[in-house]
């Protein structure tokens, strides 16, 4: 808005011409009468100042206007100067700059609420320097006195470079020093200005180091403390792979002329590390060179550089399918085979077909002798595998077999020097790849890891898991857009075709919706599921909804009946959610097969309440009545994808002239098609439709090993035979599930058809990588509108984003510390390109598997391998601390004296004296008071029945003394009244035994005399067996009135017979009379001691054997 001629401060009193549209008569009139001062600038004669450059803001784009034809030195008229309101840009050079479209920010991202500020601010005016005398670039160009403009452009470029480096972590080599090596100079050089003005994007202008920007080869960064602060250390160590183009906003990434060209082959060397020498025996002559095979013809620079880096670092190689990952692995295996004398090299792949195809590549490329190579799988016996581990050096095997051999001790982990991992994106979690590397690190600190894959992962976490699981130190990644591999990747035309539901599918969805709606409504009423449309059910969504409801208060507090009802409904709907996916994305026929299987589970008494409710629903019956005749019709195609797929395949074969060859060559096809599906039902349906056009289309299904209901799996032998027939042309179309996505070399495929979309970028890229290897290929994606189309877009965007993150290297942490050098310090192998001589034995067609034997060798015993510097045996806990402690002197134990028996005191010493008895009564038994009271000793004879049994207790149990006292009283109560007669019997027997002992001691052949004469102990008596007869056994009998046999009866037996309880009831102690016991009989203890003293002699006297020596 313009200010009026007067000095009014009212901003609303403006002239009416402020709103006049230019170009109208009113505008012209206003322009003539307007007396506002025009912007004036001082111009030197024949010289344009830097302020002459202005940008036309009319159309909103930065467009450069064509130069005016008038001469710069011409005198401008005063009228033109008055009416001229705009200035035009007059370039100094003839080449015109094209439009530049910036697709990414050059500064770090910031929150939207923060004021961003200008990207670059024009610096203030600087004092003019004297004009250079001889600085002309071209005759047609203006003199080089406009260096102020160049300095402003250079400052803008430097600011853009700084922001770009800050965005990428500050670890990119500064290209500002390359494009503007002297920003502080007064007059930049002509070459610098020429590079600054070179804008057209031609291949010739691409710098030679666009792909080989190594940090170690970059020039030192020249920074000024006045313009930049101190460097900030990045959070993660950056490892930027090669093959990436880095340029500024104006494509200013000129290479310094002092650095030699890095485009093509590089010269790398092992890292300088302070590590102990390797335990592997190295070939001193071979380690000075490394061999690059030239058997395949032209040398590819990216293969040369990646192979060289993989020799010296634990490397993750991410190359698109068909770009020679196997060749890189074979080259690295060959060199480590040359460098070591007895070390072992292992190539692991997930499946046996992948292992088999890698063997042929290594035989024909690397030339490793077949006699030193073997292929081990779980089919080989452990004894055979043990022999192979002892004699061979190169192994091709599955990771599960390798884990078993390492754990059982068959394989020696210390001998392994190189581990090549194919399909390395599987190395996450507890997969066998991770277990192998962990096991090797425990015993071996000197081995190399080479990981091969086409897609490292779909998320940052999964890629980092691969890096951590394999101990990766460097990453080499290439995409199909990388310029150094573009000449080896043929064009691939990708066609994305979307479809809508057919009328038959809509009818099926309506009927199926009516069937499932009651169950969905029940879940909604219980707040267990919030969806309304049954066609939106998914197995994952139902599982998450069930978990949330079970974890909620309603689910936890619900009774068992309600919980069972909700679980049953969720289970039924989850089983039918798969049928919905089949109907939407795969066809009506797979949908009908699934419903038949669901219906068969309700036959008879099978199935639950809600499963039978669905089967008995009228809408379900009507649906099945519609599907049955449709699927029986061989001409019926139940999905629009399938109809389009048939047309695409037919058109492809007819365009390639399939079937026009001679009759003898009709079985061989020149072009091949591969179709990827997700389920086996879909694969069988596709094969059924395409087989109607045989022999033009010769399809075959290609599935995995596991068997399912209604579909048998394929073993590895069948898989390999199908692949070979597909390569030969017997089959020209393969319909494969996920088994055909990874790794298998299925030959040249000209057309890839993805029947369904995969939300995983890994699977999507594995599918697309099957074509475009040696010739151009086509890819057709068949997607349904809606969720499937969105999944494809998400997978594609996720893949591109992940490739950028992996290439930048700022989001990942690499493990340089676990990547050993292995080679001796100072050794720098030099590349040697030569033709490898292939041994004659490598031309054999069969695989190097160990032959099966009628009797396989015995499995060797388990061997426990120990890491280096391990102390075997037992160690004390005190020695683990590292401190040496002196052993304390052990004191000799004092010998304890032999215990001696104590003499039993006399009765007078134990009993109280009369004086002590009186004192006891006076002090403790007499209680003073009005009436005399005395404390008596407890009566043993009082209440005999109660004292002979333990009385009930509450808090404190009976002690041991009470238990012994009760037992004593019980034994005393068992003594009968006629004990006097029994005591007399015992005394009579004792006296008779003394007489018998004296008689036996006088006999000459008694054992006592024999033992005394010979000075030896008598032999122990052996009881005669039932079959043997004793020799001259004399049994002595003693006849008495009681007819007792002292040799056969012991005092214990006699006492036990005496002490047997009688049926008569013993009298109470108070009822017994003391008058009858006038005799002083010995006590029971005395009798037992006497019998025990003669117990041994009585046993020996039972049998008397004749002594043969006395005869």
UniProtKB/Swiss-Prot annotation:
Its main location: nucleus. ATP binds at residues 319-326. Residues 1-18, 47-65 have a biased composition (Acidic residues). Residues 132-143, 215-238 have a biased composition (Polar residues). The keyword Cytoplasm does not apply. One of its GO terms (molecular function) is four-way junction DNA binding. Residues 852-864 have a biased composition (Basic residues). The keyword Secreted does not apply. Interacts with the MHF histone-fold complex to form the FANCM-MHF complex. This is ATP-dependent DNA helicase mph1. It comes from Neosartorya fischeri (strain ATCC 1020 / DSM 3700 / CBS 544.65 / FGSC A1164 / JCM 1740 / NRRL 181 / WB 181) (Aspergillus fischerianus). The gene is mph1.
